[in-house]
Amino acid sequence: MTDPKTKSIYTVNKDGSTVTYTSAKNVKGTSLTIPSQIKLNGVTYKVTSIASNACKNKKNLKTVTISRNVTRIGSKAFYGCKKLTRVTLGKNVTSIGNSAFENCTSLKKVTIPSKVSKIGNRAFYNCSRLTSVTIQTKKLTSKKVGSKAFTRAGKQNYKKLVIKVPKGKRSAYRTLLKKKGVSSKASIK
């Protein structure tokens, strides 16, 4: 289904009351907001996920805001959005798919919300200008963070990469993040 206002495409999920943001084919602007709900054909749906490849290689996209109802970001959802500098993840996101933000080479700052329990392989791979990562979740383990999730993140200047983690998780997350590709030169606080 296509939203007539934004031209964004949504797919109704099996439950019939929620939708997945499927495509930004007609989005030409620099800013994108994934809404918490949309009204299509007179029916209001909650937007609960972003499909794989939904915004892949959108060359002009600079900022993305993901609403509170979204729980899942699909694989390669924002892959290769090279001008993307800022992403605001909704507080209810639980899963960030494989390569979701891979090669977003202008991304500078990201906050991983407290409900995230899974970060896929290469999720932030080659986000080379990343300087600030705030991890609010206490749920991450080696099995729930994919291979190379943070490899080459902040590679422009590893010494400027600051990763803030929850109190009581500094030691465990330092070990975990280094196994998943964070440079030993990055600061984990």
Where are these regions (language model features)?
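Structural signature of tandem-repeat unit edges
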Residues: I9-G16, V27-S49, K59-R72, K82-S95, ...
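A structural signal for leucine-rich repeat
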Residues: Y125, G146-G154, T175-K180
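Consensus positions within tandem repeat domains that build extended binding/scaffold surfaces
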Residues: A51-N53, G74-Y79, G97-E102, G120-Y125, ...
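N-terminal low-complexity, Pro/Thr/Ser-rich intrinsically disordered segments
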Residues: M1-Y10
